[in-house]
Amino acid sequence: EIRLSLVGSEMCIRDRYKASHDSLTGLLNRDQFYEDVHDMVNKYHDTTFYLICSNIKDFKFINEIFGMEKGNQVLIKQAKLMASNPSERTICARLMNDRFALCLPREEFDEKRVADSIKELQREFSGNSFHLHTYMGVYEIRDRDEAVSIMVDKANIAADTIKNNYDCCVAYYDEHLLEISIEQRRLLGEFEPALQNDEFVMYLQPQVKRDGAAKGAEALVRWVHPSRGILTPYAFIDILENAGLIYKLDLYIW
């Protein structure tokens, strides 16, 4: 009976571990991270915490070009680098795919150490032309009752601002970024109806030689928005490109 009790206890411990940890990296999973971060920030009231989210640009290409085994090696190394300074006030997790999260005291965050860690990760691809771009968003926790999922969203909003900037690896969240994100999502939500309502218009801007002779024209697109007026490409082209929707505008115009 004692042996059965011990076996049952060990199985229970293993089941709890599987339910709370990522099987590949051994880090906490998303749900456990949310729970533990909420508990920690409310336990240490005198500590200001950062919540940091990281992502690897175009990680799917690593799996496609180098194979799943190489992709898993990168994820495991990323996990080790993220969790390289453990303490009772540091929590690290793999949220999903190539997305990781870290919560730690503000005074323990070191940008130089982050840059060094990213360089270490990039060495996985030394000797070939593939450039690994890892980027992070940092959110300072001010409202300890805010849902951790919202904190993660805000850190990711900051991270997304440097997704295509290979010279930068860390970005900090502020409320202005949230306003921009909301505006971008609003435009994306209006894009499909705008196509159906023929709100996009192409203008041809003449190009002339020095002698005044015409040599062609440049096609310029304007969004004739029903409530915002005429929007120039600067207001929506980058948003559509980042969302992978620019091809729909190309098909519509041409």
Segments (PLM) and residue ranges:
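Alpha-helical scaffold within the catalytic cores of cyclic-nucleotide enzymes
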Residues: 79-83, 110-128, 153-156, 253-254
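Catalytic core of bacterial c-di-GMP phosphodiesterases, primarily the EAL and HD-GYP domains
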Residues: 117, 209, 213-218, 243-254
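C-di-GMP signaling machinery
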Residues: 43, 148, 157-201, 239-244
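Active-site core of bacterial EAL-family cyclic-dinucleotide phosphodiesterase domains
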Residues: 36, 183-239
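Residue-level recognition of strand-loop junctions within catalytic nucleotide-signaling folds
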Residues: 103-106, 141-142, 224, 241
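Conserved long alpha-helical elements within nucleotide-processing catalytic cores of c-di-GMP signaling
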Residues: 16-21, 26-50, 57-83, 87, ...
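A short glycine-enriched loop-to-beta-strand structural element that forms part of the catalytic core
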Residues: 50, 97-103, 128-160, 168-174
